[in-house]
């Protein structure tokens, strides 16, 4: 088990799991990440990448880029697949969990609202308003289908020992 910056990972493992990191790597770093995953997986190793995504390639919203996630880039499913193609991974499963994530964000909004006074004391009113706007907008975007939550399972090599279904 390794919990570290992906660039520091050494050794080989049976599995590589990344939750909510790909959208923060930056598209220019996908080839390096792909090579690292390939190098880190044992033969027949399995990987799962889970990332916020979009319907098509586009620049990040300027407000979110500035206020919430500087440098983030949620990929389209095609860009996600390019990462897999770069290292000749065998894609086994692609799932879109966007409605699950909309519900998660809704719970986050409820918790944020319940603790809004504490958050404002820790930061300021501007921060609180920005995050409420971000959470509300994200809930709407996931529900409407303009944001996605992709989960992709793939192997290094032809691992035919895995279950044929979820």
Each model region followed by its residue ranges:
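Conserved SAM-binding strand-loop segment of SAM-dependent methyltransferases
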Residues: 1-6
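A short acidic, Gly/Pro-enriched loop at the edge of an enzyme's catalytic core
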Residues: 7-17
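A short His-aromatic
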Residues: 8, 24-25
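Residues lining the SAM
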Residues: 18-23
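Serine-hydrolase catalytic core recognition
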Residues: 30-33, 49-51, 57-58
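A short glycine-rich, Lys/Arg-flanked "PGG" loop and its adjoining helix->strand segment in the class I
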Residues: 31-46
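Substrate-binding/catalytic lobe of Class I Rossmann-like enzymes that use SAM or dcSAM, i.e.
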Residues: 52-164
């Amino acid at each position: 088990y390794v919990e570290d910056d992906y660039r520091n990972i050494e050794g080989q493992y049976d599995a590589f799991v990344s939750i909510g990191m790909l959208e923060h790597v930056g598209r220019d770093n996908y080839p390096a990440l792909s090579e690292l995953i390939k190098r880190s997986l044992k033969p027949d190793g399995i990987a799962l990448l889970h990332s916020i995504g979009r319907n098509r390639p586009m620049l990040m919203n300027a407000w979110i880029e500035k206020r919430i996630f500087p440098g983030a880039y949620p990929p389209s499913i095609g860009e996600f697949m390019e990462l897999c193609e770069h290292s000749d991974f065998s894609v086994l499963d692609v799932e879109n969990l966007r409605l699950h994530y909309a519900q998660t964000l809704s719970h986050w909004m409820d918790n944020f609202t319940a603790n809004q006074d504490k958050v404002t004391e820790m930061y300021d009113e501007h921060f609180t308003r920005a995050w409420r706007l971000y959470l509300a907008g994200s809930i709407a975007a996931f529900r409407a289908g303009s944001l996605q939550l992709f989960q992709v399972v793939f192997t290094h090599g032809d691992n035919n020992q895995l279950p044929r279904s979820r």
